Amino acid sequence: MIITAWSALSPYGTEDQAFAEGTTARRPLPHKPRPVPDFEPREYLGRQGTRTMGRATALSIAAATRLLTEDMDPTRTGLVLGTTNGSAQSILEVNRASRERKSPHHVQPSSIQNATMNSIAGQTAIWHGLQGPNATLAGGTTTGLLALGYCRRLLLTGRADVLLAGAVEELSEARTWVRSGTAPLAEGCALVRLETDATGGLAEVLAVTSLVVTDGDTKTAVRRAAERVLDRVSPGQVWATMGSGTGEDAESTALTTVCPQATRLPPVTEAVGQLHSAAGAFQLVTALTRAAVSGPGDRVVLLTSVEHQGIVAAAVVRIKGENVVA
């Protein structure tokens, strides 16, 4: 499975280059909620069809726009998108309206579509005319890596030729109520384009896996997941490891045990902020940008992610030694 392009709208800016430069230089961001700057959906996407569009949907549509080309067959192109619960703000507003208005059914119909979990993926596909598989995943911080595994199965079974995979989170009042950790809340959308028959490409996903922690031993679970995906490369071939940061010392210790000589890339939460379900997708594109400036030659990166409810995911990616700014 080949990564042929990527796109990211982040607190560093609306352009991919801004994200690449910000993460590689580790440019500091304000220690407060971090929106995507200068992103107004109606100005960015146009006024038609955006009056009632949710912010997360607009971010997803904007990111997908950069990854689609005219020669792609829309019937064979799909989208696998991660989210925590869709637009938390829209869910809150619909529930509030159903309680505060004269009757529970006196809710603005146009607001309901943004309050369903799979609305963002569906609206993105409709906007771009994609007719391939369309799926929404919700696996917490592991969602981005889980999406890679989901796409791998779709591609291997011939369900699609091209898939966009990633995750999106919007910054809203409602989301501040589910804040976790100490990093400032952040929003954004990160997507990669995945193909099987592409020549060249930016990177190859060698393996991806996930498992459930049933005994509370996160360290052992991370180690097992990492060892499982390292079946095509040896630990000594791994250039860098990158954890999610949510597993704290257990995750870091496990990565050191499995790949003691590898470079440690800091968790995406340290640079970008708390992205919740979008963390894994941003973790992947961060690894792509960091490898691109590390010098010539391919780089193998081991990614792991830990969701506090008991999910662990891991992936191994071989990144080609070339500029990977899409």
Model-derived features: positions:
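Conserved "HGTGT" condensation-loop signature of ketosynthase/thiolase-family condensing enzymes
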Residues: 1-133, 145, 153-156, 168-326
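Membrane-interface segments at transmembrane-helix boundaries
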Residues: 137-138
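Internal active-site segments that recognize and position negatively charged phosphoryl groups
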Residues: 150
